[in-house]
Every structure is written in structure tokens, then in C-alpha cells.
Regions:
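Extended terminal and domain-junction accessory segments
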Residues: 13, 36-47, 139-190, 290-337
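Histidine- and aromatic-enriched segments that form or immediately flank copper-ligand environments
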Residues: 42-153, 242-243, 249-285, 308-334
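Short, well-ordered beta-strand elements within core beta-sheets of diverse protein domains
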Residues: 119-121, 228-230, 242, 289-291, ...
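N-terminal, post-signal-peptide metal-ligating segments of extracellular/periplasmic oxidoreductases
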Residues: 3-108, 188-239, 324-337
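Amphipathic repeat-derived elements
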Residues: 120, 129, 138-159, 166, ...
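A contiguous, surface-exposed recognition patch within enzymatic or periplasmic domains that forms
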Residues: 165-258, 301-312
């Protein structure tokens, strides 16, 4: 018997609960190219509940989750190759209508409360995609119904697109910003009427925990040590980062140690590959792809091939939680090993 989700039976999860729902993921998007296309099946359960933020406040979310007893925000990262067929089953455990959508690829249409729907579609073009709930836009996306899909070129495990600069490993950085007043309105099936004022900022669903803070170094709650977000590598371990923004706020993604190679912007291959220490990321589903080259940091003296360097956003509010807790926002670390 399936456990019904209702207003009196919410899931309540700390950030650790989110990470445990993704247990088994190493953080890296692992891929081995195939000679032929395949069908990839995945089932998502649309669930709801509360997630405790760094300042202890419980905020309402909805998620594409792996079962009825979980709340996963963002949804699981998926990877396929050009020509594959995706068979996605959506089980809507809620009383409200939702959908599964990837722009220019698929739209499930309305999935009523309590309904299960299976959709099939081909992924024909390599790149980075956000899947999300397109109904009641942008509200269902903002409260957590989103995730990332990577599509690899045929026969390649080291290129973003045919002829792109090559990489050794790859990650998603999926950013979101959270206004708890809006989330509460959506919980009560109301359209938010207040000015958007985000108080929490996440990367892959987690926020930072600075040294000395409870949870620092715990990968289940600390974005700076979350294996999905933190970059680990030796010199030469060039890392593709697929960067998506589910939130409303514009961001500037800033890495220390190395400039990044900026390859795409909003799904379009750039005419030139720029080396940038800050990469602009549009709000409302902005997307970029970039390679962190893991080169010996050029400004280090004496020269150093190991060390820890931050990645943070250059919008100062995004580095806070609850309106002022600094270093509890959307950030992670880069480990030269």
C-alpha cells in the first residue's frame, strides 16, 4: 500500500535527509559510451514536505523523489547519449496537478493529483538540460520540482559536443534561491502576492557550512563537502561543470585557483571559448557549461599543486542564509589532490 501524502502527513527532512535520498551517487556523472542507443527508464514520485534550512527554519518543498517516503530536491541527476529513448514514469502523490517538462524536448501535459503517467521521448542533441514542472510556472519549479539531464555525444565520454574541448570528469551545479513566504503560499495553493525576497540559496539542494559551524565537513548537509558539488581532482583532471539555475536570481559563478573555459550559454555553443573567473548565469532557468581545467594555480607562490579553493557566487546575498548568516549560502570547494 502506498503511503498517501497530505496536509497532515508531511515529510520533514533536514539537509541530511535530502542527501540520503541520493545514496549511492558518487557525485561524478559516470559515463561509458555505447555503440547503440538504449531505452533508459526512470520513475519519479512527486512528493512534498519540509526541509530545515541552515538557521533552523523549516521551509515547504515539492520534489521529484525516488519513492513515496522521500523528498528529493533537486531530483536525481540523469545521463544518456544522443539517440537514447527516455521512458519516464511520474507518480503524482499530491492533490494538485503537475507535469514533467524539458524545453524543446518533451512536455508530459497535465498529470492530475493521484495520477500516474508514463512518457517516452528521444534525446537527439548532446547538451545539458533542466527537467522541471512546467505547470503553474514558475512556482512549482521554484519549490523544488526540477533536476538535471546530461546528454552525451555518440561514442564520446570526454566531449560536451562534437569537437568541444575535452574533459576527464563531469558534475552538475544546480542553483536555486528560496523565498519561504512564496513557498508557504504555494503550499496553500495560493499565488504569491508579495515581492520576491529569497532568504536561502542552494547548490544541488544544499547550503554551505563554514568552519566552526555545526555540520561543517559533513557531506550530507555541507555543500562545501557534498560529493555532487565539490570538485576533486589532480592537476590535469579537467572537469566539465553543467551549471543550471532553477531560481529567479541572476548569478555570477566565480572559481578560485583557475579560470574556467566557458563553452555554452543557454544551450548555444559560444563562438569563442573564453577563460573567465566569473561566468554570468541568467535567472529563471539560465544555463552554462564550463570546464574547470585543474591546472597548477598560476598565481600561487611558491607553486602548489595541492590545496583547497572556493567556488562562490558574486551576488553577496547568495552567500548568506536567513538574511545575514554569511557563508551559509550557495558555495562549494575545489580540492586539488
Amino acid at each position: 500500500m502506498k503511503k498517501e501524502m497530505n496536509r497532515r502527513n508531511f515529510l520533514k527532512l533536514s539537509s541530511a535527509g535530502i542527501a540520503s535520498a541520493l545514496l549511492g551517487s558518487t557525485g561524478l556523472l559516470s559515463w561509458s559510451p555505447r555503440a547503440e542507443a538504449e531505452t533508459i527508464s526512470k520513475t519519479f514520485y512527486i512528493t512534498e514536505g519540509f526541509i530545515t534550512q541552515p538557521d533552523g527554519v523549516d521551509v515547504y518543498f515539492r520534489g521529484f523523489s525516488p519513492d513515496t517516503n522521500s523528498l528529493t530536491v533537486p531530483g536525481a541527476q540523469m545521463i544518456a547519449q544522443e539517440g537514447d529513448t527516455m521512458r519516464i514514469t511520474i507518480v503524482n502523490t499530491l492533490g494538485t496537478s503537475h507535469s514533467f517538462k524539458i524545453d524543446d524536448v518533451v512536455d508530459s501535459g497535465r498529470i492530475y493529483g493521484g495520477q500516474t503517467k508514463t512518457i517516452e521521448f528521444k534525446v537527439n542533441n548532446a547538451g545539458s538540460y533542466m527537467y522541471y514542472d512546467g505547470r503553474n510556472a514558475p512556482y512549482n519549479r521554484l519549490v523544488g520540482l526540477h533536476g538535471g539531464l546530461a546528454v552525451m555525444p555518440n561514442g564520446r565520454d570526454d566531449e560536451l559536443y562534437d569537437g568541444s574541448p575535452r574533459f576527464v570528469q563531469q558534475h552538475f551545479w544546480l542553483f536555486n534561491d528560496i523565498d519561504p513566504v512564496w513557498h508557504n503560499a504555494i503550499r496553500n495553493n495560493r499565488t504569491p502576492s508579495t515581492r520576491y525576497s529569497p532568504r536561502y540559496f542552494t547548490i544541488n539542494g544544499l547550503s554551505g557550512r563554514p568552519p566552526g559551524a555545526p555540520g561543517n565537513g559533513d557531506p550530507s548537509i555541507d555543500a562545501m563537502h557534498d560529493h555532487r558539488s565539490a570538485l576533486h581532482g589532480h592537476v590535469g583532471d579537467r572537469t566539465l561543470v553543467r551549471i543550471l539555475n532553477a531560481g529567479k536570481c541572476q548569478q555570477s559563478v566565480h572559481t578560485h585557483a583557475n579560470h574556467m573555459e566557458w563553452l555554452t550559454e543557454n544551450g548555444q555553443v559560444r563562438d569563442d571559448v573564453w577563460l573567465k573567473d566569473c561566468i554570468y548565469l541568467e535567472g529563471n532557468m539560465g544555463q552554462v557549461d564550463a570546464i574547470f581545467p585543474f591546472e597548477t594555480p598560476p598565481d600561487a607562490y611558491p607553486a602548489a599543486s595541492t590545496g583547497v579553493y572556493p567556488m562562490h557566487l558574486h551576488t553577496e546575498m547568495s552567500q548568506t542564509a536567513g538574511g545575514g548568516l554569511y557563508m551559509f549560502g550557495a558555495m562549494t570547494d575545489i580540492f586539488f589532490e
